[in-house]
């Protein structure tokens, strides 16, 4: 909805107007054609580096779901983001869902962070050198606005970990 695809989600006759993935032919906000979000953090690192080399300003934002975090490219992107420095916002959409069952140390840490409302001493993102903000209700627009206002001028990469409920507000999906 934030990238100009609102009609496709609100009106049945427009459902087929979008691919469901990043596509520059669908939105000026998409810079790459990709099929999975494990690539989002690495691609955002490249955009942030280019912005910095050109002496430009502005936010670069990567969005990645919890189900995509275990992808090798996602982990490489997080590692590089910590070294890159500069403004980079990494939104982790944690709805505790993925195509396959979430398991392993990373998902245990995400659960621990959810259970402690982001206050766990053992924080995967902080241990990598990234700043971290937790949003308990990622379906709450006011909470999201507050979180993004707090990080928009960050001078180093920050993870905004939002816990969402997939389909919230739409009875058939809840």
PLM feature segments, named:
Residues 26-28, 48, 67-69, 95-97, ...:
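Short, glycine-/Ser/Thr-/acidic-enriched flexible segments
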Residues 1-84:
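Cofactor-binding active-site loop characterized by glycine-rich and histidine/acidic residues
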């Amino acid at each position: 909805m934030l990238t100009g695809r609102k009609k496709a989600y609100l009106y049945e006759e427009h459902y087929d107007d979008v691919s469901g993935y990043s596509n520059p032919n669908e939105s000026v906000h998409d810079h790459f054609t990709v099929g999975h979000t494990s690539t989002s953090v690495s691609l955002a690192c490249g955009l942030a580096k280019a912005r910095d080399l050109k002496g430009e300003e502005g936010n670069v934002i990567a969005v990645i779901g919890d189900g995509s975090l275990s992808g090798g490219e996602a982990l490489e992107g997080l590692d590089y983001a910590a070294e890159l420095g500069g403004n980079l916002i990494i939104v982790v959409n944690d709805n505790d869902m993925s195509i396959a069952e979430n398991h392993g140390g990373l998902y245990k840490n995400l659960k621990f962070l959810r259970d402690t409302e982001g206050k766990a001493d053992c924080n995967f993102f902080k241990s990598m050198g990234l700043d971290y903000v937790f949003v308990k209700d990622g379906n709450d627009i006011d909470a999201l606005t507050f979180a993004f206002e707090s990080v928009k001028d960050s001078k180093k990469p920050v993870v905004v970990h939002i816990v969402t409920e997939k389909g919230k507000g739409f009875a058939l999906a809840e």
